[in-house]
UniProtKB/Swiss-Prot annotation:
The keyword Iron-sulfur is annotated on this UniProt entry: no
Ranges of the Extracellular topological domain: 122-123
Function statement: Plays an essential role in the homeostatic regulation of sphingolipid de novo biosynthesis by modulating the activity of the serine palmitoyltransferase (SPT) in response to ceramide levels. When complexed to SPT, the binding of ceramides to its N-terminus stabilizes a conformation that block SPT substrate entry, hence preventing SPT catalytic activity. Through this mechanism, maintains ceramide levels at sufficient concentrations for the production of complex sphingolipids, but which prevents the accumulation of ceramides to levels that trigger apoptosis.
Protein name: ORM1-like protein 1
Cellular-component GO terms for this entry: endoplasmic reticulum; endoplasmic reticulum membrane; serine palmitoyltransferase complex
Transmembrane segments: 27-46, 47-64, 101-121, 124-140
Record-linked Pfam families: ORMDL (PF04061)
Compartments reported by the entry: Endoplasmic reticulum membrane
GO biological-process terms attached to the record: ceramide metabolic process; intracellular sphingolipid homeostasis; motor behavior; myelination; negative regulation of ceramide biosynthetic process; sphingolipid biosynthetic process; sphingomyelin biosynthetic process
Domain remark text: Ceramides bind to ORMDL3 N-terminus and stabilize it in a conformation that physically restricts the accessibility of the substrates to their binding sites in the serine palmitoyltransferase (SPT) complex, hence inhibiting SPT catalytic activity. In the absence of ceramides, the N-terminus is flexible and permits substrate binding, thus liberating SPT from inhibition.
Keywords: Endoplasmic reticulum, Membrane, Transmembrane, Transmembrane helix
Residue numbers on the Cytoplasmic membrane side: 1-26, 65-100, 141-153
UniProt similarity note: Belongs to the ORM family.
Amino acid sequence: MNVGVAHSEVNPNTRVMNSRGMWLTYALGVGLLHIVLLSIPFFSVPVAWTLTNIIHNLGMYVFLHAVKGTPFETPDQGKARLLTHWEQLDYGVQFTSSRKFFTISPIILYFLASFYTKYDPTHFILNTASLLSVLIPKMPQLHGVRIFGINKY
């Protein structure tokens, strides 16, 4: 028995996506968003799918790729302050199960949105642009890279 030893992470952001039930909660949240959009009377099914995809990807971009730092005071000498949540996830190790899940989920949503919009060119362009905006920052080659100095500080 270790008395007086903390069993917490140095940076809680690194493991939050591996928590019990996180993936199920995430999927249920996306499903709930879609049901809410479908319940709005003047939205057609293709519009609801496109909005679900765009809102999901916008939220994913903001929370995983735009916001930097951690809401916790961490003993890592400020290293996490300069990293996005995606870069902190699983201590920066690439191709973990959480990273794979959060990479494949927008792709699955994109396929669903494309299918239910019947590949309408307008919806297809919007959905593709939205997908690329969240897939490109997830590439291992862009880990820690700030294009044109955007989000550098």
